[in-house]
Amino acid sequence: MRLSPSFLSLALVIFVGEVVARNVVARASNPASVTGTRKVSLLKNVAGLPAVPTAQQVAVSSLNTDDIQGDILVGMHKQQQRFYFFTINDAATFKTHLAADIAPVVASVTQLSSVSTQPLVALNIAFSQTGLNALGVTDNVGDALFTAGQASNTVGNLKETTDNWVAQFKTPGIHGVILLASDDKSLIDQQEASIQSTFGAAISKVYSLDGAIRPGAEAGHEMFGFLDGIAQPAISGLGTPLPGQLVVDEGVIIVGGTNDPIARPADGWMTGGSFLAFRQLEQLVPEFNKYLLDNAPAVDGKSLQDRADLLGARMVGRWKSGAPIDLTPLADDPALGADPQRNNNFDFTHANFSITTDQTHCPFSAHIRKTRPRADLVAPANSIIRSGIPYGSEVSAAEAAANATTNERGLAFVSYQSQLNKGFQFLQNTWANNPGFIFGKNVQPGQDPIIGQNSGAIRSVVGLDPANPTGALSMGQFVVSRGGEYFFSPPISALTGKLAA
C-alpha cells in the first residue's frame, strides 16, 4: 500500500450497498452517510470479467489503497449508481463539511475489497477545474484538457459538436460529481438526501443520471448486448494478471504513481488521485439492430439473424457472450466468453496469416482492436480503467417493432487515467475517430464502428464482411454523445488537507 495523499476526483462515488432486507441499516452517526452492517457484497462479479481485487491482494499490494478512492480500481462491478453533479455556492461551508462529514465516509479501495469492510454507502468525490477554482485551488495540475473542460473544444478534440449535449454539460457550471452506487435504489435516495441535508445551501444539484446493471442474463452486458469490461488492464503491484491481460504501471492510472511522467504540484497533494472522464453516451439500440439485419453479410448455411449477429460481432470484435472473434471468427462460444482465463488471451496474430492483411479473424476496424490494438501496437501508456454502467430502460416491444428509439438508454461512461491526453482523449480521437488507424495495414480501416465520431458525417468502415475484407460499409452514428465533463478524483487525504484548507 504505497502512494501519498492527494488527487481525488470530484466524483463523490457512494456505493450504497446491498438490498435493505439483506443488510442491517442503522441511524447514521455521521449525518452525511447511511450506515449499517453489510452481509453481502455491494459489488457484483460477472462471469467473464476480471474480478474485484480481493482483500488478500490489496493487503500485499504496493499501492496505498487506503488513500485511493474505491471507484478508481474497482471497475465495472456496480449494480446501481447515481451520478450527482453539483455546483458549490458557499466554499467555506462546503470545505467544512467536506473535511468533517464527507472525507470520513469516502470508500477506499481497501474498504471495497472485503464485504466485512464495505459500507452500505461507499462514497467517492471528484472535482472539475471550475470546482477546484471555487475551492481556491489554483495549482497547475499538469493536464491541459482537464483545465479547459470537456466542452471547450469538442469538434477538435472529440470530432463531435455539442448539439446533442445535455444543456448542463455545455457550460462550466458543474463543480463536481457524486457517484452513489448500490443494488438498492432506496439507499441511494437516502444517501443523496443525507448529503443535501449536510451541505444545505452550500451546494446545488445541477444534474443527475441513474445507471444500473442490466437484468438477468444481461448482467455485465452493455445496451447493444455485448459483455463489457473484459479487457481492463491490470495494475502492476495489485493482484495477479489474467492470461492476455495488459499490465500497466501504477502511474498510468494513478497520479504520482510509478512512471507518471508529469510534473505535479510540489506539495504532493494530488498523489493517489486519478483523472475521471465522464461521458453520457446514448445508444440507439433498435436502429443498431436494424442496421445489422439490413447489412448482414452473405454466409452459406446461416440464418439472417445469425448473419446479423456475425456483423455485430465483427463491429465490436467480440460476440455478445464476450468470446473474441479473433479466437472464434464465425460462431459464438459462450463458454469461452465466460472464461476469464481464455477470453482475453489473444493478440490478433495467427500462424500463416499476415497481421498487415488478415481480417478473416478480426477486422482492423473492430472496436476492441481500435481501442486496444495488442500486437498491432503495444501501447501500455494509452490505457484506462473503465468504471461505467448502463443507464435507461430496456428496449420496449414498440421500439423494437418500429426500429426506432423513443426512450433514451446508453452507457454512463467513466474512465480513470493519470493523463487525459494519453488515456480517454487519445483512445477516442487518435485511435477510434481516426480512419487511418490501425496504421500499416493494406487498407484504411475507417472509424471505430461503435464509438468512432466523424463530426456528424456518415462514417465509412472497412473489413466487416469476411468475404470482402477490402469492402466498406457506410453507417451513421449508433452512439450519440449527450455530453460530459472531466474531473479529478483526489486522494482521500486531500479532502481534509489541500481541498479543505
Curated annotation (Swiss-Prot):
Keyword presence, Zinc: no
Cofactor(s) the record lists: heme b
Domain of life: Eukaryota
Principal localisation: secreted
Pfam families: DyP_N, Dyp_perox_C
GO cellular component: cytosol; extracellular region
Binding site for heme: H367
Catalytic-site annotation from UniProt: D228 (proton acceptor)
Propeptide position ranges: 22-60
Matching InterPro entries: Dimeric_a/b-barrel (IPR011008), DyP_N (IPR049509), Dyp_perox_C (IPR048328), Dyp_peroxidase (IPR006314)
Compartments where found: Secreted
Influence of temperature on activity: Thermostable. Retains 50%-90% of its activity after heating for 2 hours at 60 degrees Celsius, while no decrease in activity is observed within the same time at 30 or 40 degrees Celsius.
Residues that carry a glycan: N352, N403
Signal peptide bounds: 1-21
Cofactor binding note of this UniProt entry: Binds 1 heme b (iron(II)-protoporphyrin IX) group non-covalently.
Keywords (A to Z) from UniProt: Glycoprotein, Heme, Iron, Metal-binding, Oxidoreductase, Peroxidase, Secreted, Signal
Activity-pH behavior: Optimum pH is 4.5 with 2,6-dimethoxyphenol as substrate. Retains more than 50% of its activity after 4 hours at pH 2.5.
EC number: 1.11.1.19, 1.11.1.7
GO molecular function, one term: peroxidase activity
Keyword GTP-binding in annotation: no
Record's catalysed reaction(s): Reactive Blue 5 + 2 H2O2 = 2,2'-disulfonyl azobenzene + 3-[(4-amino-6-chloro-1,3,5-triazin-2-yl)amino]benzenesulfonate + phthalate + 2 H2O + 2 H(+); 2 a phenolic donor + H2O2 = 2 a phenolic radical donor + 2 H2O
Family statement: Belongs to the DyP-type peroxidase family.
Function summary: Manganese-independent peroxidase that is able to convert a large number of compounds, but its physiological substrate is not known. In addition to classic peroxidase substrates (e.g. 2,6-dimethoxyphenol), oxidizes dyes such as Reactive Blue 5 and Reactive Black 5.
Protein name: Dye-decolorizing peroxidase
Organism: Exidia glandulosa (Black witch's butter)
Gene: dyp1
